[in-house]
């Protein structure tokens, strides 16, 4: 703990802000190839089988990212686009995979919030 005199002479060191998605390295998205696609269970009090994938990114980081929406066509060696954004009830999952981009298709028969799930506009 510095004294008031020390603070007057030197000033306080500025606190560095730690990124919530370090692996992105200030990029909006990163590309990667799935090495493992699996399901995991959320922490209490929720219960489900959440779909996640382990993805080594082009910058060398290996991240666990969430596959949103109902159903997906991902498997090992699928090329995906990863964005930041954590899943609150899955510890260690701090990234999302972008639907409708590269090898991951959009959600089928999606009518609302289509842009978030890469779904095309339905025909009349």
Swiss-Prot record:
One of the record's GO molecular function terms: structural constituent of ribosome
Domain of life: Bacteria
GO cellular component: small ribosomal subunit
Assigned keywords, A-Z: Methylation, Ribonucleoprotein, Ribosomal protein, RNA-binding, rRNA-binding, tRNA-binding
Annotated stretches, region: Disordered: 104-124
Compositional bias segments (type: Basic residues): 113-124
InterPro entries the UniProt entry points to: NA-bd_OB-fold, Ribosomal_uS12, Ribosomal_uS12_bac
Modification type 3-methylthioaspartic acid: residues: 89
A Pfam match: Ribosom_S12_S23
The keyword Transferase appears for this protein: no
Biological processes per GO annotation: translation
NCBIfam families named among the record's database cross-references: rpsL_bact
Function statement: With S4 and S5 plays an important role in translational accuracy.
PANTHER family: 30S RIBOSOMAL PROTEIN S12 FAMILY MEMBER (PTHR11652)
HAMAP family, A to Z: Ribosomal_uS12_B (MF_00403_B)
Oligomer status and interactors: Part of the 30S ribosomal subunit. Contacts proteins S8 and S17. May interact with IF1 in the 30S initiation complex.
Family indicated by similarity: Belongs to the universal ribosomal protein uS12 family.
UniProt protein name: Small ribosomal subunit protein uS12
Gene designation: rpsL
């Amino acid at each position: 703990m510095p004294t008031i005199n020390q603070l007057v002479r030197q000033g306080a060191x500025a606190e560095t802000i730690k990124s919530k998605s370090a692996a992105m390295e200030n990029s909006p998205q990163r590309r990667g190839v799935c090495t493992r696609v699996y399901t995991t269970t959320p922490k209490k009090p929720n219960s489900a089988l959440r779909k996640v994938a382990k993805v080594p990114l082009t910058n060398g980081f290996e991240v666990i990212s969430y596959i949103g929406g109902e159903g997906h066509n991902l498997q090992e060696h699928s090329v995906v686009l990863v964005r930041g954004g954590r899943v609150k009830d899955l510890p260690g999952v701090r990234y999302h995979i972008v639907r409708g981009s590269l090898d991951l298709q959009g959600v089928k028969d999606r009518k609302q919030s289509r842009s978030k799930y890469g779904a095309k506009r339905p025909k009349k």
